[in-house]
Design a protein with these regions (language model features):
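Positively charged n-region of N-terminal signal peptides that target proteins for export
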Residues: 1-7
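Hydrophobic membrane-insertion alpha-helices, especially the h-region
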Residues: 9-26
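Short linear S-[DN]-x-LW-Φ motif typified by the pepsin-like aspartic protease active-site region
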Residues: 26-116, 122-123, 143-164, 169-183, ...
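N-terminal start-of-chain detector that recognizes signal peptides
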Residues: 39-43, 50-51, 60-63, 83-86, ...
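A short, polar/proline- and glycine-enriched secondary-structure boundary/capping micro-motif
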Residues: 90-91, 122-130, 202, 260, ...
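Acidic/polar low-complexity surface segments
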Residues: 122-141, 294-312
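Conserved Rossmann-like nucleotide-cofactor binding loop
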Residues: 168, 187, 206, 226
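Short, surface-exposed interaction patches in beta-rich subdomains
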Residues: 192-193, 199, 208-223, 227-336
Length: 336
């Protein structure tokens, strides 16, 4: 073994040994006091006594409500399906000082949740846990720190909901609401099923991931810096605007006039089988390509950096209008 290789080996061994020593010291100094939250590990900055500085509400039944107001600075919101016909709430929140970090009021069918000045900010470190990811998922469902968890009956529909989260995520099994107003400044939305009449959502810096979305009246969606993924959609009138991010929509149908504008990002729309020819479609990519391979009708025109596709189905037919300033447009139909 030459001198350089021997030096490298000895240095690596020394660093590994130092890492073991430091990890062990950190563990016994309070590093073991951590918990999992959505998509990341939460690492508490305190020692073992930090558990004493928590505001805890074990799962407890609350009054029924049809209106929901939420205003959080750092907390996450998790809406789950109740196992029965009752409403419940639980949380485990860090606090600064003695003040409860959450103020809430449930009166006359209206639930209001507001993060107070007593809340504590969070510090996150993300790890790829590989084979341990399943364990993390189970743990985070069981014990979520700095997350308010609401349980709503499966068939319950809210009349109004206004949710504002500055630096937190929103996760929901389902949201059934006539009028939904949502604003996330720096967080993600993970929604399995959403049914709305009116849906107004704004995202400054975060991703939107929805498995199933239905909006029967009007939808307004603005995304600043993040990707939007909707696996299945049934939409009426509305507009989707993206500043910097990709849009992916699968198995979608449009029953009104829908406009999609993307400043910087690709747009991919999969329409429900057989619906494209019955829809007025106008696609324009100013600095990109338009791909409509597989569609039997419509006209494509390419000039320099601009690509256009158009299909005319009649004045009474629904309309899909997609424009990309810097990105590609892909339009397909589902197999079934």
């Amino acid at each position: 073994m030459n001198k350089i290789a021997k030096t490298v080996l000895m240095t690596g061994t020394a660093l590994c040994a130092a890492g073991v020593v430091l990890s062990t010291a950190g563990y016994f100094a309070g590093g073991k006091d951590f918990t999992y939250t959505s998509d990341h590990m939460y690492v508490s900055g305190g020692n073992s006594s930090s558990h004493k500085n928590l505001a805890v509400m074990k799962k407890e039944q609350i009054d029924d409500f049809t209106k929901l107001n939420v205003d959080f600075q750092d907390f996450d919101l998790d809406i789950r399906t109740s196992d029965d016909d009752h409403y419940y709430m639980e949380y485990k929140l860090e606090k600064n000082g003695t003040k409860n970090p959450l103020t809430w009021k449930d009166k006359d069918g209206e639930l209001t949740l507001e993060e107070s000045a007593g809340g504590s900010g969070s510090y996150y470190i993300t790890y790829d846990l590989g084979i341990f990811s399943k364990h993390v998922d189970l743990t985070q469902k069981k014990d979520a720190l700095n997350t308010v968890i609401l349980y709503i009956p499966e068939k319950a529909q809210l009349s109004e909901a206004e949710l504002q989260l500055s630096d937190g995520d929103l996760a929901a099994d389902q949201l059934l609401c006539k009028e939904m107003t949502l604003e996330l400044l720096n967080g993600d939305l993970m929604l399995d099923k959403g049914e709305f009449e009116k849906f107004d959502a704004k995202f400054s810096d975060g991703d939107l991931n929805v498995k199933e979305l239905q909006c029967t009246d009007n939808m307004q969606l603005k995304s600043g810096n993040g990707d939007v993924t909707i696996k299945k959609a049934e939409l009426a009138d509305g507009q989707i605007a993206l500043s910097d991010g990709d849009l992916q929509m699968g198995n979608s149908s449009f029953n009104g006039d829908m406009k999609i504008n993307s400043s910087c990002g690709d747009v991919s729309v999969e329409m429900k089988n057989g619906s494209a020819e019955k829809t007025n479609i106008y696609l324009k990519a100013a600095d990109g390509d338009v791909d409509t391979e597989g569609l039997s009708r419509g006209k494509t025109d390419n000039e320099e950096d601009t690509s256009v596709y158009e299909n005319k189905a009649g004045a009474s037919a629904p309309t899909l209008n997609v424009k990309c300033s810097d990105g590609d447009i892909t339009l397909t139909e589902s197999e079934k």
